[in-house]
A protein has these predicted regions:
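Acidic/hydrophobic-patterned starts of short beta strands in beta-sheet-rich repeat architectures
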Residues: 12-21, 57-66, 103-112
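Blade-level signature of beta-propeller repeat domains, shared across WD40, Kelch, NHL, RCC1
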Residues: 96-171
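Structural motif
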Residues: 24-30, 70-72, 117-126
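Beta-propeller blade termini
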Residues: 3-10, 48-56, 83, 94-103, ...
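Short loop/turn segments that connect beta-strands within beta-propeller blades
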Residues: 30-33, 76-78, 128-129
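Repeat-based blade/solenoid architectures
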Residues: 1-6, 40-51, 86-97, 145, ...
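A structural motif specific to WD40 beta-propellers
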Residues: 36-37, 82-83
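Loop/turn-rich, solvent-exposed surfaces of beta-rich toroidal or solenoidal domains
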Residues: 46-73, 91-98, 117
């Protein structure tokens, strides 16, 4: 079993890649399904998922993933860990969320963190260095797509295909 797949152009080459989390690895696959890179994962549920966002505005997506012990931000091209923060969870069907929750014009990372039987909390992570790019203030569901919901949380009468909007072409 694996969590929900994340599809994005992680390396800016114009072709989408696929991020899948299994019991032991977060793996990024090229469009021909060859492995681009993989990183060890500690996910006993086998149901967590990664998120993609270009925090730096360089055209290359970062991969954000939290397993049972750690929230990590990976370079989408190489798989190098850019940031690693302690954030435990028993894991189930969950993934980090990217939204501008404090309306400061910068993206934040939101995820659940707990110590398996103790305090449970939702944690918001912000950039401590260069400001992150702006993003929407809305993330309404596990199956979020920017064109599925309006900023005021109403449902669009006619949805635009997000594949037609390059910056939003992340699934």
């Amino acid at each position: 079993a694996a969590g929900r797949a994340t599809v994005a152009d992680f390396d800016g080459d114009g072709a989408n890649e696929l991020a899948i989390v299994s019991h032991n690895f977060l793996s990024i696959f090229e469009s021909d399904f060859s492995v681009k890179w993989r990183s060890p994962s500690d996910d006993g549920s086998r149901r967590t998922s990664a998120t993609a966002f270009d925090f730096e505005g360089d055209g290359d997506m970062e991969v954000v993933y939290r397993d049972e012990t750690t929230l990590r931000i990976f370079d989408g091209i190489t798989g190098a860990i850019k940031t690693s923060l302690s954030c435990g969870s028993g894991t189930r069907v969950e993934m980090p969320v990217i939204a501008d929750v404090d309306a400061d014009g910068e993206a934040e990372i939101i995820c659940s963190c707990n110590n398996l039987g103790g305090a449970q909390r939702t944690v918001v992570f912000t950039s401590d260095q260069t400001p992150w790019l702006p993003t929407r203030k809305v993330w309404n569901s596990l199956h979020y797509a920017p064109t599925f919901i309006n900023d005021d949380l109403t449902i669009p009468a006619q949805r635009q295909d997000k594949a037609d909007i390059p910056r939003l072409d992340v699934y």
